[in-house]
A protein has these predicted regions:
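Extended low-polarity, hydrophobic cluster-rich segments
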Residues: 11-16, 40-45, 75, 84-85, ...
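Short coil-to-beta transition motif at edge beta-strands of beta-rich domains
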Residues: 5-36
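Intrinsically disordered, low-complexity, charged/polar segments
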Residues: 55-117
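Generic short amphipathic/hydrophobic targeting helices enriched at N-termini
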Residues: 4-7, 42, 106
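Basic/aromatic-rich interaction segments and small domains that mediate binding to polyanionic partners
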Residues: 26-74
Length: 117
């Protein structure tokens, strides 16, 4: 994935370790403890592009048993290493609601089947 692929509704897979090392200290713990990870990979969706501030707002899926917050939203700098992010195949864009309805097993299947570019 590159910056040009970051459209609202794009669902992607990214290495959790890369994101964790790029986060500020207090965000690191929240991310490690609350975002659903499988095989060191996380699944997210592009929610908003803030050109003025230079950030892309993304929501990451949390474990299915968390009924309070189905996702955690964080800002990712435009200068991030976008080639670490892989678009989920099919090119279909999701609404935020559709993304938050994904189950852990759906994400595991995407990762196991390498259903991303």
């Amino acid at each position: 994935m590159n910056y040009e692929d970051t459209n609202i509704g794009t669902v992607f897979i990214a290495p959790a370790s890369y994101l964790i090392e790029e986060l500020e200290e207090k965000e690191k713990e929240i991310f490690k403890n609350r975002v659903f990870q499988y095989d060191n990979l996380v699944c997210g969706i592009v929610d908003k592009i803030d050109s003025k501030r230079g950030y892309v707002w993304v929501t990451f899926k949390v474990p299915d048993n968390n009924y309070v917050d189905p996702g955690i939203t964080l800002a990712i700098d435009f200068k991030a290493n976008w080639c670490m992010f892989c678009v989920v195949k099919g090119g279909k864009r999701f609404s935020s609601y559709q993304f938050l309805c994904l189950k852990e097993q759906d994400i595991i299947e995407i990762i196991k089947n390498k259903d991303y570019d």
